[in-house]
Amino acid sequence: YNISFNVNTDSSTLIGTDTFRNNQVELRKGSVYRCAEEGGFGIFDEINMAKNDAASVLHATLDHRRMIDVPGYERIDLHPATRFIGTMNYGYAGTRELNEALVSRFLVIDMPALTKENLYRIIRHDYPEIKEEALDAFGGLFLDLQEKADNSEISTKCMDLRGLLSALGAVKIGLTPWQAVQMGIINKAFDIFEREIVSDMAMTRIPEDWTRENVF
């Protein structure tokens, strides 16, 4: 069960809400309710996007009580196979600090920075036909951006793995590598000075005269 959190997420989104069906009021079960009832994995995607009071309804679900109390309906115990996983990008715009009571109910895995070996493995997995020189160029650009971001010289907006992979996909269907990098990486920086820095870094890695044949 995938539950995408946002600023409008509330308890009714997670647990359920009243609905009118067959001439009577019934509970329309939310994703958390169904996961608790049937078992399986519940994925709280971007858990730090929601307001803390929305996530507070999960407290009894996530601690030793392992139950959900639905006002006006019944109290249900969690299926033994129910597990919940929360994901978040700490520090992203629009996110907030997590409630301490909520954090204490999770085991936290801190994802390390992407290494060169893992980055190349991901790129090769999605684009096995990529040439070695292009792999070094695109992978090297991402690692350069990662180093700049770690040193607080640029923001993390351009250090976008999805953008890098999308740029390669755009090259595959006909864009020049430079155009693809502009749209997938450079233009993610909305500050003009930061964009110039990222553009200069890209120029050192991706020649403007490259074509699709230089990449695939």
Identify the function of each model-found stretch.
Residues 1-143, 150, 176, 204, ...:
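AAA+ P-loop NTPase catalytic core and its hallmark functional loops
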Residues 115, 124-216:
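Alpha-helical lid/collar subdomain of P-loop NTPases
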